[in-house]
Curated annotation (Swiss-Prot):
It holds the Pfam family SecB. Homotetramer, a dimer of dimers. One homotetramer interacts with 1 SecA dimer. The gene is secB2. GO terms for molecular function: unfolded protein binding. Keywords: Chaperone, Cytoplasm, Protein transport, Translocation, Transport. Gene3D superfamilies: SecB-like. One of its GO terms (biological process) is protein transport. GO terms for cellular component: cytoplasm. The lineage of its organism: Bacteria, Pseudomonadati, Pseudomonadota, Alphaproteobacteria, Acetobacterales. It comes from Gluconobacter oxydans (strain 621H). Belongs to the SecB family. Its main location: cytoplasm. The keyword Cytoplasm applies. It comes from the Bacteria. This is Protein-export protein SecB 2. One of the proteins required for the normal export of preproteins out of the cell cytoplasm. It is a molecular chaperone that binds to a subset of precursor proteins, maintaining them in a translocation-competent state. It also specifically binds to its receptor SecA.
Amino acid sequence: MSQTYADTVTGTPASLDVSDSLPSSSSLIIGSQYLRTLSIDVQNTPDVYRELPSQPHIGMMVDVTGRQLGDQPTFEVSLVIRAQGFERAPTQDAPNPKVLYELSVAYAGLFGLTGRIPQDAIEPLLLVEAPRFLFPPARSVMLNTVREAGFPSPNIQPIDFHELWQSRRAQQR
């Protein structure tokens, strides 16, 4: 039987470690990590490069999903980052600045669970702890792609997956 765990998040700096509340015999095993998909769509080329701002504004949306693989305690967790680079930050007077590029990165990993893990701890392990391992390489792929597309690399801060998971759960209630 396949179980799916899903959450949608957006970002702020990292904080709490969910694994602190687990028995010491329990653990999250990190397997392979891989780039699932990558796409970038640069708007209005080559004209977009004529008046390129020194530091475009970036808007991001982050999705985290997890699914069990077969009957084993093995899961695929995917971190999807969708970003848009804007000419400038939106303001009240100009809420829709010109889009320079649209980027989508899906970075995934295989994770195993060992030991006696309470059922209510599985979801936070998959949607909080696992994405913490996936975010640094996903961010690196994203920054390199933006740079290779001819734009200045944005400054992307770590995401607090625990806070965002809790916020999403509160919205669902």
